[in-house]
Amino acid sequence: MSQEKYIMAIDQGTTSSRAIIFNQKGEKVSSSQKEFPQIFPHAGWVEHNANQIWNSVQSVIAGAFIESSIKPSQIEAIGITNQRETTVVWDKKTGVPIYNAIVWQSRQTAPIAEQLKQDGHTKMIHEKTGLVIDAYFSATKIRWILDHVPGAQERAEKGELLFGTIDTWLVWKLTDGAVHVTDYSNAARTMLYNIKDLTWDDEILELLNIPKDMLPEVKSNSEIYGKTAAFHFYGGEVPISGMAGDQQAALFGQLAFEPGMVKNTYGTGSFIIMNTGDEMQLSSNNLLTTIGYGIGGKVHYALEGSIFIAGSAIQWLRDGLKMIETSPESEQFALASTSDDEVYVVPAFTGLGAPYWDSNARGSVFGLTRGTSKEDFVKATLQSIAYQVRDVIDTMQVDSGIDIQQLRVDGGAAMNNMLMQFQADILGIDIARAKNLETTALGAAFLAGLAVGYWEDMDALKELNATGQLFKASMNESRKEKLYKGWKRAVKATQVFTQEEDADDDAK
C-alpha cells in the first residue's frame, strides 16, 4: 500500500517562519513556527540575519515532520511564500551574505528614493514597474548595500555576488546553490522589473548601476524550479514547484482567479488586492499595480492598496490604552455600544496608507461628547478599519472600471463578526470569510501542487477553500453614506491639522 502524499508550504514572514503540511483536501495536518531576531541598527532601520532566517526554516521543516510523523518521502512538492521586498545580497561561491537582509519596512534607503524622485524618474518607473518610488521596494536596498559594503560594487560587476528576495534565498539554500530564481510576484516588487514586458528593465538597472548578472531568473508562480538537496531536506529530494509573495499567495489561496475578485487580509495592517486580469492597469489614485500570479504562460495583473493600521489598532486598545484585556474582547465591547456611530477614530499612527499616502498624518479622534463611553471608543476603532478598506475598494473601482460584488477576507481581525458585518454594511457588498484562514500558506501549496499534478487544475481547487461565513449588507443607503461622509471629513481634518503644524514649523 502506497503512503499518502502531502504538500508542504514554507511561509517565511517578517517575524517568524512557518512550515505547514496540507493534504489533498487542502486541510492542514501539521505545522511548526519559529520566531527569529529583529535587528534595529538605527531609528527607522530594520534588518534580519539571512542565515538566521534559513536556520528558522530548517527548524520548522523538522518541526512539521516531527509533529505529524510524516516523512520527507511523503512530500510531493514544496511551495514557498514570503515577506516581500526584503533584500539579500550574498557571495556566489561561499553563500555568505555580505550584509544583513534589509527588511521591507526599513527606511534606511529613503534618501536614494528621494533622489530618484528629485531627478524626475517617477513617471518612468511607475509606467514600467507599476510602483511608486519608495524605500519599501528592493531596488534602493540593493543600491544601499553596494554603496555601503566595501568592494561590493566591484565584486557585483565581476559576477561574484547574487541578489534575491527571501523566496530566492530559500530556494538557493534548499537546492544547495544549484538554483537562482524568483517568481513574477516577487520580481514585481523589486522596482527593477518591467511588468509589461516581463523582463528586468535595463534602463532602471543602468540608472541605479545594478549589474544584471546579480539578478535571479524570473519564472512563473507554478512550475518545478529545482529539487531540494537531500541533506537540506532530511534525506528527501523534493520538487520546489510553487512560489509567490505573501499577499499574492493569499489572493491565490482565496481562489480569486477572475478579474474583479478581491481579497483583503486583516493583519497588523490590511492588504487589499484585486485581480484585474491580463491587462496591466496603472492606477491614477495611488494604488500599486503589480502581478497577481502567472501560470502556464498567462499573467494576471492586480491592483494593491496597503493600509498601515488594522489589527494593530486593536492591539493599541489592549496594550496602549488598556481598554480591553484581549483582542477578541473588542467585539463584545463594540456590540455593547449604544452610540449612533458619531465618534470617529483615524488611526494614522504611522501616517495614512492607500489611497492617501500621507506619511505626515497622525492619529486623531472626532465626535467625543460627555456621554461617550469606552464601548463607543472601541467600536469607533473597529469601524476605522472598515472605513479604510472602503477608501481602497472605492478607489479600485474607479481605477479598474470593475464593479466589485464581493470581498474575500482572511487574517486575524477577520474573525471579529461585528467588524465583518460593519464592513459589509459600509461597502454595501457581501463579505466572504474563508473557511480555512491559512490562505497565504494554502496559496503557496496550491501553486506547488498544480505544478506536479497533485491537483489536476484550478477548477479542482475551487472545492477546497469554501466560504466559511457570508456577511450580507443590511444598512440602508442613506445611513451608510452619512457615516462614510463623516469618516471622510475626519480624515480631511486629520490631514489639515498636520499640514498646519508643518506650516507653523516653517514659519519659525
From Swiss-Prot:
UniProt superkingdom: Bacteria
Assigned EC number: 2.7.1.30
Residues modified as Phosphohistidine: H232
GO CC annotations, alphabetized: cytosol
Top-rank EC class of the record's enzyme: transferase
PROSITE patterns, A to Z: FGGY_KINASES_1, FGGY_KINASES_2
Residues given in the record as ATP binding sites: T14, T15, S16, T268, G311, Q315, G412
Record-level Gene Ontology MF annotations: ATP binding; glycerol kinase activity
GO terms, biological process: glycerol catabolic process; glycerol metabolic process; glycerol-3-phosphate metabolic process
Protein residues bound to glycerol: R84, E85, Y136, D246, Q247
Keyword list, A-Z: ATP-binding, Glycerol metabolism, Kinase, Nucleotide-binding, Phosphoprotein, Transferase
Gene3D superfamilies assigned: 3.30.420.40
Summary of activators and inhibitors of this protein: Activated by phosphorylation and inhibited by fructose 1,6-bisphosphate (FBP).
Pathway(s) it belongs to: Polyol metabolism; glycerol degradation via glycerol kinase pathway; sn-glycerol 3-phosphate from glycerol: step 1/1
Binding site for sn-glycerol 3-phosphate: T14, R84, E85, Y136, D246
UniProt catalytic activity: glycerol + ATP = sn-glycerol 3-phosphate + ADP + H(+)
PTM notes: The phosphoenolpyruvate-dependent sugar phosphotransferase system (PTS), including enzyme I, and histidine-containing protein (HPr) are required for the phosphorylation, which leads to the activation of the enzyme.
SUPFAM superfamilies for this protein: Actin-like ATPase domain
Coiled-coil residue windows: none
Protein family according to the UniProt entry: Belongs to the FGGY kinase family.
Quaternary assembly: Homotetramer and homodimer (in equilibrium).
Task of the protein: Key enzyme in the regulation of glycerol uptake and metabolism. Catalyzes the phosphorylation of glycerol to yield sn-glycerol 3-phosphate.
Name by which UniProt lists this protein: Glycerol kinase
Biological source species: Streptococcus pyogenes serotype M18 (strain MGAS8232)
